């Protein structure tokens, strides 16, 4: 008999029309992904993005060519090739250096990390004492200390900016709509990502809204009825985010460990992005995927607490971008597939997978708004904002755990980076609460007599 974990990752288990497990679904990312035969049977759309073959001209670059002039009839000995240039080890992590980048000898990994950190204005946090050891093995564990080490050894911000300035001429030449023409490969990528997003997250116009009067007029510490409903919807949304990830080209070609790392790191970011795209400023409300619409006070009482105003402010900042479903899907994919996440086994492979997503969003956004070239960088900046909100969300979860009467729902626990922080030393009940058959039935009445629930998350 198949376990709950196997059903989640079995082919078609999350397809259209399938039911959801209740809020007590005992799912853990490592158990569900690592070594799960049904998961391994899934065939990704693009498994192992192959490296393009080198042009034939490149094959001869390392060989000293001989003269083929018809005037030279006497063969001459070829000149010996110059000895390979040897660089000092990477000043940051002591790995093999590929040359001098931004002022110091560095490897490709640290070069790319420093460039991305400066170009995206990334703000990192050290979870220890800001004195982590950075070497080839530990460099991906603390981004804050790695960036500080880059500065300490002499990497230059200005060198990164100057590198970007060299491309200004090329950017200026991109004045005609033809410059934003998408290649067939990018068109296909955009189609797949957009479809994956739309089929795991219906847009606001597709929903039949309904409201509740529960604690709508005044803020309280926690409305347990609203919390139960929100945690149920959040659980469903996490399942949908897993499905979205599995449908992204190349994602299942990553190692199982890296898939787990990326999902756990970005799940809360994507959940926040999704709910914020369903913000209605006229009523100051947010709508979930079953149509439930809550005002700001109710969102506070449902469990957001002190995080509420920050989330609503972010939702308001998204409005001027006027992102469509395709752009939201691409931004979600970029947020998920990011080589800067800690503890990745193959960050360079993840970066390689992210590059076409960045290019697709850049060209799509520019083609959609020819007179607004700044929209693409503004969208990317929202990823930094999302990470900040997610950090505060994890902190809120710690205090929330003390306010709810039972254990934190397991999927929400697994979404957070340190699930052990939710372990209760008291005598709280251990078994996960069982969901009623009414909750599990697609389209059935909820346990609180609410409107029919389609199989969607927030």
Curated annotation (Swiss-Prot):
NR LBD domain span: 185-419
Keywords: Cytoplasm, DNA-binding, Isopeptide bond, Metal-binding, Methylation, Nucleus, Receptor, Transcription, Transcription regulation, Ubl conjugation, Zinc, Zinc-finger
Gene Ontology MF term list: chromatin binding; DNA binding; DNA-binding transcription factor activity; nuclear receptor activity; nuclear retinoid X receptor binding; RNA polymerase II transcription regulatory region sequence-specific DNA binding; sequence-specific double-stranded DNA binding; zinc ion binding
GO CC terms of this entry: chromatin; cytoplasm; nucleoplasm; nucleus; transcription regulator complex
Chain positions of cross-link Glycyl lysine isopeptide (Lys-Gly) (interchain with G-Cter in SUMO2): 172, 401
Main location: nucleus
Biased segments, Polar residues type: 62-71, 448-458
DNA-binding region per Swiss-Prot/TrEMBL record: 90-155
Protein's UniProt keywords contain Glycosyltransferase: no
Residue ranges, annotated region (Hinge): 156-184
Listed InterPro entries: NHR-like_dom_sf, NR_DBD_RAR, NR_LBD_RAR, Nucl_hrmn_rcpt_lig-bd, Nuclear_hrmn_rcpt, Retinoic_acid_rcpt, Znf_hrmn_rcpt, Znf_NHR/GATA
Region (Disordered): 58-83, 161-180, 409-458
Entry's localization field: Nucleus; Cytoplasm
Region (Modulating): 1-89
Subunit structure: Homodimer. Heterodimer with a RXR molecule. Binds DNA preferentially as a RAR/RXR heterodimer. Forms a complex with PUS1 and the SRA1 RNA in the nucleus.
Domain remarks: Composed of three domains: a modulating N-terminal domain, a DNA-binding domain and a C-terminal ligand-binding domain.
Function: Receptor for retinoic acid. Retinoic acid receptors bind as heterodimers to their target response elements in response to their ligands, all-trans or 9-cis retinoic acid, and regulate gene expression in various biological processes. The RAR/RXR heterodimers bind to the retinoic acid response elements (RARE) composed of tandem 5'-AGGTCA-3' sites known as DR1-DR5. In the absence of ligand, acts mainly as an activator of gene expression due to weak binding to corepressors. Required for limb bud development.
Family recorded in the similarity comment: Belongs to the nuclear hormone receptor family. NR1 subfamily.
Protein name in the entry: Retinoic acid receptor gamma
């Amino acid at each position: 008999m198949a376990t709950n974990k196997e059903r989640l990752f079995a082919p078609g288990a999350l397809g259209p029309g399938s039911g959801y497990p209740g809020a007590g679904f005992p799912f853990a990312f490592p158990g569900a992904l690592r070594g799960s035969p049904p998961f391994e049977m899934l065939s990704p759309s693009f498994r192992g993005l192959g490296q393009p073959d080198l042009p034939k001209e490149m094959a001869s670059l390392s060989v000293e060519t001989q003269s083929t002039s018809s005037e030279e009839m006497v063969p001459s000995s070829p000149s010996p090739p110059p000895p390979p240039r040897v660089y000092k080890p990477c000043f940051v992590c002591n790995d093999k250096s590929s040359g001098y980048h931004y002022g110091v000898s560095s490897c490709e990994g640290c070069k790319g990390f420093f460039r991305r950190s400066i170009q995206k204005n990334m703000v990192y946090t050290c979870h220890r004492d800001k004195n982590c050891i950075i070497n080839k093995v530990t460099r991906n564990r603390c981004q804050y200390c790695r960036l500080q080490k880059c500065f300490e050894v002499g990497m230059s911000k200005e060198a990164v900016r100057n590198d970007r300035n060299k491309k200004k001429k090329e950017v200026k030449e991109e004045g005609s709509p033809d410059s934003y023409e998408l290649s067939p490969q990018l068109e296909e990528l955009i189609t797949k990502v957009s479809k994956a997003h739309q089929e795991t997250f219906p847009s606001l116009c597709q929903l039949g809204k309904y409201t509740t009067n529960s604690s709508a007029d005044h803020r309280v510490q926690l409305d347990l009825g609203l919390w139960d409903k929100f945690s149920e919807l959040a659980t469903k949304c996490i399942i949908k985010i897993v499905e979205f990830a599995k449908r992204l080209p190349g994602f299942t070609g990553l190692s199982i460990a890296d898939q787990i790392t990326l999902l756990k790191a970005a799940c809360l970011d994507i959940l926040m992005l999704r709910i914020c795209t369903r913000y209605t400023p006229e009523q100051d409300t947010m709508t979930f995927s079953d149509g439930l619409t809550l005002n700001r006070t109710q969102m506070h009482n449902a469990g957001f607490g002190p995080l509420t105003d920050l989330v609503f402010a972010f939702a308001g900042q998204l409005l001027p971008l006027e992102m469509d479903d395709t752009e939201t899907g691409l931004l979600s994919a970029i947020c998920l597939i990011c080589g800067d996440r800690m503890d990745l086994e193959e960050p360079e492979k993840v970066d390689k997978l992210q590059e076409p997503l960045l290019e697709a969003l850049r060209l799509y956004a520019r083609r959609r708004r020819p007179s607004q070239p700044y929209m693409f960088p503004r969208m990317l900046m929202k990823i930094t904002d999302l990470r900040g909100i997610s950090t505060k969300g994890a902190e809120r979860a710690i205090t929330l755990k003390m306010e709810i009467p039972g254990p934190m729902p397991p999927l929400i626990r697994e979404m957070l980076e340190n699930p052990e922080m939710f372990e209760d030393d008291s005598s709280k009940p251990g078994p996960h609460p069982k969901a009623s058959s009414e909750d599990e039935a697609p389209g059935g009445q909820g346990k609180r007599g609410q409107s029919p629930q389609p199989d969607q998350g927030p």
